[in-house]
């Protein structure tokens, strides 16, 4: 049980300190990719929603 809480604490701690990483800027040569990079974190959610749509299409067998 303690190991689980330790792991959760480590994960939360690392996300708090790496939050500045998420707000970093791309190098100037890749500035045209900014709109794509902004959308990229949402892409896994589309797959998650697709699973529900697929199950609804096959009537949740």
From Swiss-Prot:
Name which cysteines form disulfide bonds.
Answer: none
| SUPFAM superfamilies reported for this sequence | Photosystem II reaction center protein K, PsbK
Q: Where are the transmembrane segments?
A: 36-56
Q: Entry's InterPro entries?
A: PSII_PsbK, PSII_PsbK_sf
A Pfam family reported for this protein in Swiss-Prot or TrEMBL:
PsbK
Q: How does it sit in the membrane?
A: Single-pass membrane protein
Q: What is its main location?
A: plastid
Keyword line: Chloroplast, Membrane, Photosynthesis, Photosystem II, Plastid, Reaction center, Thylakoid, Transmembrane, Transmembrane helix
Where it sits in the cell: the answer is: Plastid, Chloroplast thylakoid membrane
Superkingdom assignment: Eukaryota
What is one cellular component GO term in this UniProt entry?
chloroplast thylakoid membrane
How it assembles, according to the record, is: PSII is composed of 1 copy each of membrane proteins PsbA, PsbB, PsbC, PsbD, PsbE, PsbF, PsbH, PsbI, PsbJ, PsbK, PsbL, PsbM, PsbT, PsbX, PsbY, PsbZ, Psb30/Ycf12, at least 3 peripheral proteins of the oxygen-evolving complex and a large number of cofactors. It forms dimeric complexes.
UniProt lists the family membership as follows: Belongs to the PsbK family.
Protein name listed in UniProt: Photosystem II reaction center protein K
């Amino acid at each position: 049980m303690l190991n689980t809480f330790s792991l959760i604490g480590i994960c939360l701690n690392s996300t708090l300190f790496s939050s500045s990483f998420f707000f970093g800027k791309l190098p100037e040569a890749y500035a045209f990719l900014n709109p794509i990079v902004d959308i990229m974190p949402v892409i896994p959610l589309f797959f998650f929603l697709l699973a529900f749509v697929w199950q609804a299409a096959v009537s949740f067998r």
